[in-house]
Amino acid sequence: MPRYFEGKLDAKGQKIGIVVSRFNSFITERLLEGAVDALVRHGADEQEIHIARVPGAFEIPLAAKKMAASGAYDAIIALGAVIRGSTPHFDYVSSEVTKGVAAVSLESGVPISFGVLTTDSIEQAVERAGTKAGNKGFEAAVTVIETVNLLRSIN
């Protein structure tokens, strides 16, 4: 019979780092609220949630790398909002942030949940920050809780 590994939605005892971008703060603050809410609802101690604020989304991977390298965190949540404008800047930033966060997680072995919105409009970002499409910060936190527990069960 095969053996299955699954992560529980229990954040008790988990120490979580959150890296959140200040740019587009009217969106990212909602994502942050959602993430903290999810962590606390699932048993995390607020004292074990550490938040690093970075200027923009491009700086998220470096701060996440520093947190991961510290060995102090069970997981990290990356939160930001990159909204398409009239120049190719959106494409460069969203691509590099995505690649950077994935690289940090794979290289460090620390789970990093990607809660960086990459939307075509402000309206889409608002929808994903707690209105019509839920709160992607909340979802990122739930994902990281489950992933931490999954990896623990594999070990």
Swiss-Prot record:
Query: What is any one of the record's Gene Ontology cellular component terms?
Result: cytosol
**What does the entry give for GO biological process?**
riboflavin biosynthetic process
According to UniProt, this protein's pathway is: Cofactor biosynthesis; riboflavin biosynthesis; riboflavin from 2-hydroxy-3-oxobutyl phosphate and 5-amino-6-(D-ribitylamino)uracil: step 1/2
UniProt entry keywords in alphabetical sequence? Riboflavin biosynthesis, Transferase
**Mind telling me which InterPro entries this protein's record contains?**
LS (IPR034964), LS/RS (IPR002180), LS/RS_sf (IPR036467)
Q: Explain the purpose of this protein.
A: Catalyzes the formation of 6,7-dimethyl-8-ribityllumazine by condensation of 5-amino-6-(D-ribitylamino)uracil with 3,4-dihydroxy-2-butanone 4-phosphate. This is the penultimate step in the biosynthesis of riboflavin.
- Its recorded name reads 6,7-dimethyl-8-ribityllumazine synthase
- Gene name of this polypeptide: ribH
